[in-house]
Amino acid sequence: MKPTMLLMITVFLIFPALSQAESPFSSLQSAKEKTTVLQDLRKICTPQASLSDEAWEKLMLSDENNKQHIREAIVAMERNNQSNYWEALGKVECPDM
């Protein structure tokens, strides 16, 4: 009885740790995708002033519609759909600078 109970406790403690071990990699992947999208947007909406990456990101994400189109572009990238990716980026409105 006791060895079985110890085995069950061990299993219940190890499996959640294994599932959480993948989460840092998924956040790195999403950060990479976000960076790629923002770099492509810099090509489309060339800023007149030299803005830092953080300022450029805040400027692009200040509009709710732009946020939605950027999310759509990231989903298209995850699905490896270049057509929808560029279509979503084409809908992003370049801010006045």
Curated annotation (Swiss-Prot):
<protein>
    <recommendedName>
        <fullName>Uncharacterized protein YicS</fullName>
    </recommendedName>
</protein>
<dbReference type="InterPro" id="IPR048144">
    <property type="entry name" value="YicS_fam"/>
</dbReference>
